[in-house]
From Swiss-Prot:
A Pfam family the protein falls into: Queuosine_synth
Pathway listed: tRNA modification; tRNA-queuosine biosynthesis
Xref: SUPFAM superfamilies: QueA-like
MF (Gene Ontology): S-adenosylmethionine:tRNA ribosyltransferase-isomerase activity
Major localization listed first in the record, in broad terms: cytoplasm
Name of protein: S-adenosylmethionine:tRNA ribosyltransferase-isomerase
EC number: 2.4.99.17
NCBIfam families, A to Z: PRK00147.1, queA
Function: Transfers and isomerizes the ribose moiety from AdoMet to the 7-aminomethyl group of 7-deazaguanine (preQ1-tRNA) to give epoxyqueuosine (oQ-tRNA).
Protein location: Cytoplasm
GO biological process: queuosine biosynthetic process; tRNA wobble guanine modification
Phylogenetic classification of the source organism: Bacteria, Pseudomonadati, Pseudomonadota, Gammaproteobacteria, Thiotrichales
Amino acid sequence: MKTDDFDYKLPEELIASYPLENRDASRLLKLNKQTGEIADYKFTDFIDFINPGDLLVFNNSKVMLARLYGSKTTGAKLEYLIERIKNPKLFETHIKANRSPAIGSEIYVESTHAKVLDKDGGMYLLEIQGDKDIYQLMEEFGHIPLPPYMKRDDEEFDAERYQTVYAQDLGSVAAPTAGLHFSKELMQQIKDKGVDIAYITLHVGSGTFKPVQVDDVESHKMHAEVISVPVEVCQKIRQTKENGGRVIAIGTTSVRSLETAGQNGQIEPYQGETDIFLYPGKKFNVVDAMITNFHLPKSTLIMLVSAFADKEKIIKAYEHAIAERYRFFSYGDAMFIF
């Protein structure tokens, strides 16, 4: 299976650099994965596609203000993208610099002193030596780490709009974007309809934006992300399945978390890392339907939806979305695949 099979041509003007005024004002492309039938709706119509007894599973991870700036002791400028926090003074980060800082060197994160303890590929392990910890630095100086394809600096409204309304557990470098469409009003309508809701956590890493760079899909090494699928979520899923309801994952992060926890055919609580890679030929044991945004060409995420719905059907749906001028990527429109 070739990576190029998952390529498509996207007019640049369809990349959504800014959110719509209202979260739930997006469009929703409905795709029947059995028949390939495609239909155009508003996102608020989603309430009509779910039934009492269904279970929606959301990722409650919160985006960190992960972009920070600083310098070397020489004054040379540094830009940080915090990837993972080990403890309040120890964290992994990407560093953009004219010349990479050496292991053992002392640098500044904003105006706070830090030491480079280790480097693995493009990832640095830093320890803060000053009084402030990384959480305080992010709170005081941090920026929302918008995806590179938006080609703009973050603005004040992004701090709210690049978070889901139910975000709780701090740790992501990127938003679980399928959830961005859900307003507080829509969440209430879902509850009022008798549809059950559950929350898992997957802290999205920066690897989510990386295109697959090997020719053969199966050779790709997936990045690892931290997930939590609690026992009560597993109980809800088992109950839903027993009663004939559907498990509907909100976003590919929820899909990957649930399928990690259900890899043995039975959903079990899971806490730890996952590097699960779902591509055509892989089996889904837990998820019956999903809400997802439109994904980058040749990405692991377009491979995931192609595994769920069949590659030809996905490519046709994407061609339809382009012809109908849907908005793409993080601040773009969504699909309901069932």
